[in-house]
Curated annotation (Swiss-Prot):
Residues 2-15 form a propeptide. A motif (Nuclear localization signal) lies at residues 24-27. Monomer. Homodimer. Interacts with FGFR1, FGFR2, FGFR3 and FGFR4. Affinity between fibroblast growth factors (FGFs) and their receptors is increased by heparan sulfate glycosaminoglycans that function as coreceptors. Found in a complex with FGFBP1, FGF1 and FGF2. Interacts with FGFBP1. Part of a Cu(2+)-dependent multiprotein aggregate containing FGF1, S100A13 and SYT1. Interacts with SYT1. Interacts with S100A13. Interacts with LRRC59. Interacts with CSNKA, CSNKB and FIBP. While binding with LRRC59, CSNKA and FIBP seem mutually exclusive, CSNKB and FIBP may cooperatively interact with FGF1. The keyword Acetylation applies. Predominantly expressed in kidney and brain. Detected at much lower levels in heart and skeletal muscle. Residues 127-143 are annotated as: Heparin-binding. SMART domains: FGF. It comes from Homo sapiens. PROSITE patterns: HBGF_FGF. This is Fibroblast growth factor 1. Disulfide bonds: none annotated. Heparin binds at residue 33. In the nucleus, phosphorylated by PKC/PRKCD. Plays an important role in the regulation of cell survival, cell division, angiogenesis, cell differentiation and cell migration. Functions as a potent mitogen in vitro. Acts as a ligand for FGFR1 and integrins. Binds to FGFR1 in the presence of heparin leading to FGFR1 dimerization and activation via sequential autophosphorylation on tyrosine residues which act as docking sites for interacting proteins, leading to the activation of several signaling cascades. Binds to integrin ITGAV:ITGB3.
Length: 155
């Protein structure tokens, strides 16, 4: 190839006909603030725990589109959601409150912003004591909003 030439590739048009589903393994979302794992309980409560053996911390992240994810508890089947007051809760069915914008930060942690409230910059966050931080109380630069996706098994 000569200097200055541009190579273009044709778009992939073939379909792969894969069955629906998510092929990613469940993850644990470890919060930098206080060392808690994000947890969705059967009653819809969302909080953090340091107990790595808790079954409610296993989360399935599935992409809706580029950078947009649903976060679902593998144990309860509930989706992480943020209501109009910025409170986190578990929803039985996926809806617009369950979509989050996932972003990999420079420090290799992930942040999750509620897509519905993206213009307000409401992040998923945990306080040092493990309780949820309301969306309006979160902002960029806080440790409370930094999550590290970890494998479920420690090996």
């Amino acid at each position: 190839m000569a200097e200055g030439e541009i190579t273009t590739f044709t778009a992939l048009t073939e379909k792969f006909n894969l069955p629906p589903g998510n092929y990613k393994k469940p993850k644990l979302l470890y919060c930098s603030n206080g060392g808690h794992f994000l947890r969705i309980l059967p009653d819809g409560t969302v909080d953090g725990t340091r107990d790595r053996s808790d079954q409610h911390i296993q989360l399935q992240l599935s992409a809706e589109s580029v950078g947009e994810v649903y976060i679902k508890s593998t144990e309860t089947g509930q989706y992480l959601a943020m209501d109009t007051d910025g409170l986190l809760y578990g929803s039985q069915t996926p809806n617009e409150e369950c979509l989050f914008l996932e972003r990999l930060e420079e420090n290799h942690y992930n942040t999750y912003i509620s897509k519905k409230h993206a213009e307000k910059n409401w992040f998923v966050g945990l306080k040092k004591n493990g309780s949820c931080k309301r969306g309006p109380r979160t902002h960029y630069g806080q440790k409370a909003i930094l999550f590290l996706p970890l494998p479920v098994s420690s090996d």
